[in-house]
A protein has these predicted regions:
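Pyridoxal 5′-phosphate
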Residues: 1-375
Length: 375
C-alpha cells in the first residue's frame, strides 16, 4: 500500500530484462551490427513512450529517472532562455525534485514564484494569471501530486503559459499510467519507470520540438546531445514493457481506492481525507487520510508489523525532519498533519487486501485512541 514510493517490478518486465541481459550487450553508439541492433531496440522503447503521451519518437530522451528529468527541464531551460527572462513559476506542492532546483535557481539570480493551492491541492489560477508575464521563461507544474493524489489542471495552465511566451514542464511521474497525458499541452514531460512496475534508475524526458533546452550532462553526445552517457539498455527494455502495460489497470485502481475510502469512512470515526474525494480531480492510486487522535509515524509502524506498508508522505524526503509541505500548503492543521497516512495502490493489489487494510487500520487506530496518549 505504498506504491507511490515505488512499485513492484512486474513479472513481464523482469522476463524481458533477463532476456536482454543475455543478448543485448552492444553499445548503441557503436557502428557495427551489435550496436545497431541495440539502438533499434531502444528506439522501439522510445516509440512506445512517444505514442503513450502524444509526442514523436525524436522528442523522447532517456535519463536515470524522474529526478534527473526534472532537473534537466529546470536547469536546462533556465540556461537556454536566461536572455529571454529570469522568472520561473511553480506551485507550493511540487516534488522536491522540482522545488530544490527552484531554490538553487533563486540563488543563481532567477526569480521563482510559488503559486498557492486550495484545500484540494488545485493551484489558484487567478494568482497564477497575475504572476505570468513576458519575462516568464518556464512554468513547472506536476500532473498528479504524489502525497494527496490531486490531478492538477496542467492543460489549462500550459495554455496560459504559452499565451505569455513561456514554456511548460510537467512532472508526470505519478500521473503516467493513471491519467491521459496526450494533448496536455506540455513542452516537457518527466516520467519514471519504477513508478509503473518497471526497473529503478530509468526514466525519460519528452521535449517538444523547438523548445529551448541545454544539456546539463556533457560527454559523448548520446540522446542527440541532450543527455550524454551510455544508455542503460537492459533497464530501457524493461521500461518499454512497463510502458506497454502502464494503462491496463487504471479502472481497477479507481475501484480499489473507492473501496478503501468507503471502508475507512464507515469503520473509523474522526478521519479527514486530505485533498479531494472527487474522482474527476483525484487519481485512483493515492488516498491521504488523517486519523485524528493518532500519530502517523507510529500508526505506520503498527501497520508494518501486520504486513501492511504505508507512508506518511513522500519517500524521497521522508528521512528529512519537518512536516509535509503539501499538507501545510492545503491548510491542514498540525494535528491533521501529524496523524496523516498515505495509502497508495497498485494494479496488483486485490479487494481482499483492501479489506484487510481497513480491518487492521481500524484496530490500530482504536488501540491508540483507547490509550488516549495523543488527545
Amino acid at each position: 500500500m505504498d506504491n507511490s514510493s515505488t512499485t513492484k517490478q512486474s513479472k513481464e518486465v523482469t522476463e524481458v530484462m533477463i532476456r536482454s541481459f543475455e543478448k543485448d550487450f552492444g553499445n548503441p553508439s557503436s557502428l557495427h551490427e551489435l550496436g545497431r541492433t541495440v539502438q533499434n531496440r531502444i528506439n522501439d522503447v522510445r516509440g512506445e513512450i512517444a505514442k503513450s503521451i502524444g509526442f514523436s519518437d525524436s522528442e523522447i530522451f532517456f535519463t536515470s529517472g524522474g529526478t534527473e528529468s526534472d532537473n534537466l527541464a529546470l536547469f536546462g531551460v533556465a540556461d537556454a532562455r536566461k536572455r529571454d527572462g529570469k522568472q520561473i513559476i511553480t506551485t507550493k506542492i511540487e516534488h522536491p525534485a522540482v522545488l530544490e532546483p527552484c531554490r538553487k535557481l533563486e540563488k543563481m539570480g532567477f526569480e521563482v514564484v510559488y503559486i498557492d493551492v486550495d484545500k484540494r491541492g488545485i493551484p489558484i489560477l487567478k494568482q497564477y494569471e497575475e504572476a505570468l508575464n513576458r519575462k516568464t521563461i518556464l512554468v513547472s507544474v506536476m500532473a498528479v501530486n504524489n502525497e494527496i493524489g490531486t490531478v492538477l489542471p496542467i492543460e489549462k495552465m500550459a495554455e496560459m503559459a504559452h499565451d505569455q511566451g513561456a514554456l511548460f514542464h510537467t512532472d508526470a511521474v505519478q500521473g503516467f499510467g493513471k491519467i491521459n497525458l496526450r494533448g496536455c499541452g506540455a513542452d516537457f514531460i518527466s516520467i519514471s519507470a519504477h513508478k509503473i512496475h518497471g526497473p529503478k534508475g530509468v526514466g525519460a524526458i519528452a521535449v517538444r520540438k523547438g523548445s529551448k533546452i541545454n544539456a546539463m550532462m556533457l560527454g559523448g553526445g548520446q540522446e542527440h546531445g541532450i543527455r550524454s552517457g551510455t544508455e542503460n539498455i537492459n533497464g530501457l527494455i524493461g521500461f518499454g514493457k512497463a510502458v506497454e502495460m502502464a494503462y491496463d489497470g487504471a479502472e481497477h485502481l479507481r475501484l480499489l481506492k473507492r473501496r478503501l475510502l468507503e471502508g475507512l469512512k464507515s469503520e473509523i470515526s474522526d478521519i479527514k481525507v486530505n485533498g479531494s474525494e472527487d474522482e474527476t480531480i483525484s487519481t485512483g492510486s493515492i488516498l491521504n487520510v488523517s486519523f485524528l487522535g493518532t500519530r502517523g509515524e507510529v500508526l505506520l509502524h503498527t501497520l508494518e508489523s501486520k504486513g501492511i506498508f504505508v507512508s506518511t508522505g513522500s519517500a524521497c524526503s521522508s528521512n528529512k525532519k519537518g512536516k509535509s509541505h503539501v499538507l501545510s500548503a492545503i491548510g491542514c492543521s498540525e494535528k491533521e498533519i501529524e496523524s496523516a497516512i498515505r495509502f497508495s495502490i497498485s494494479e496488483y493489489n486485490t479487494p481482499e487486501e483492501i479489506d484487510i487494510t481497513i480491518e487492521k487500520t481500524k484496530a490500530a487506530v482504536a488501540g491508540f485512541r483507547k490509550l488516549g496518549s495523543f488527545r
